[in-house]
UniProtKB/Swiss-Prot annotation:
Chain ranges passing through the membrane: 25-45, 85-105, 118-138
Keyword Transcription regulation listed: no
Membrane topology value: Multi-pass membrane protein
Listed name of the protein: Uncharacterized membrane protein YngA
Superkingdom, taxonomy of origin: Bacteria
Gene Ontology biological-process annotations: polysaccharide biosynthetic process
Amino acid sequence: MTATRIFYEGRFVTLKEKIKTLGRFCTVGVGNTLIDFGVFFLLTACHVSYLPAQICSYTAGIVNSYVWNRNWTFCVKRKADGKEIVRFLMINIAASGITFLLLYLFQNCGCSLLVSKLAATIGGMMMNFIGNRIWVFGDSLKNIQDQE
């Protein structure tokens, strides 16, 4: 029996394939978040102010994100080009701006550092998923071969 295929983003895909890609994106996201939180709280424990700590921790997370999402989540086979890297950086700069703003706002509203960081992370992850899925790696999704 063959799997039901749907036409999505210019090609036919199985629901299993879509769930697998989303699962991989989420797995990479968890890894990015652990790196982000680990670096952030390590730096703040060393008395680095929370805003510079955010810049450093977020940067560590985006480097991890690019490598894993490109090679594992979206299975990009073509050589990385400047356009893709610039798009990735633009999305991450925008997401970083959102996390920075949310962290600042929640901290200045009296929320705990953990609640502030969680809220900022959720906002940044939403921006990141949408941008990477549609704009950065979107063309690659049309070329993924069934891995069944």
